[in-house]
Amino acid sequence: MEASDGQGGEGDKPLEQVTNVSCLETSSSASPARDSLMRHAKGLDQDTFKTCKEYLRPLKKFLRKLHLPRDLPQKKKLKYMKQSLVVLGDHINTFLQHYCQAWEIKHWRKMLWRFISLFSELEAKQLRRLYKYTKSSQPAKFLVTFCASDAPERSLLADREDSLPKLCHAWGLHSNISGMKERLSNMQTPGQGSPLPGQPRSQDHVKKDSLRELSQKPKLKRKRIKEAPETPETEP
């Protein structure tokens, strides 16, 4: 009986903890920011989300600095990003060291970084990579990774160009893909459609120019005939 009572007591503890956490969640459910976090927490179940949130709650200030205004100078962005990642990454390592067994470390490291990524435009793997570069004093790699994530327009253009072969195949078009990419780039950058002096011109331009010249020749002949002065005929 004593053993059964002991088991019952141990079984009641986690239920009591879950009940307390659910009460906290219902009291804070009015916040739209937290609701949106729950909706976008891909790969995080509700219990894992709550665990990550409670452990990282004291570091709200550093979580906010992962998403800075776009008009903030680049130097300040780098400074705040490095400071926040060092504090958050060290906090995660402390959690893994003191609260996780060896087989749990990989899982909880992944979950905690994924939770942190909810406060940033970067993915969890990118944030963890930036943390490693900061801790190992590799500023060049940090800068390359950080700046690459700050240029979404380039990646969007690359995605469009990569999707061209798929579109051509789906529509049954078997034309020159490189030519289509060139025309696409000319359309996206107005004013650069005409070739620069000294650059070879495409066959389409050559054909159009030759047809234009042929159509203009008879007009010039007619114009010359009209403009020629009438000369009186002379008898022999």
UniProtKB/Swiss-Prot annotation:
Transmembrane segment boundaries: none
Biased amino acid composition, Basic and acidic residues: 202-216
Keywords, in A-Z order: Cytoplasm, Nucleus
Any single Gene Ontology cellular-component annotation: cytoplasm
Species this protein is from: Homo sapiens
Organism superkingdom: Eukaryota
Record gene name: CHCT1
Region: CHD1 helical C-terminal domain (CHCT), residue numbers: 44-145
Cellular localisation: Cytoplasm; Nucleus
Annotated spans, Disordered: 184-236
Protein name: CHD1 helical C-terminal domain containing protein 1
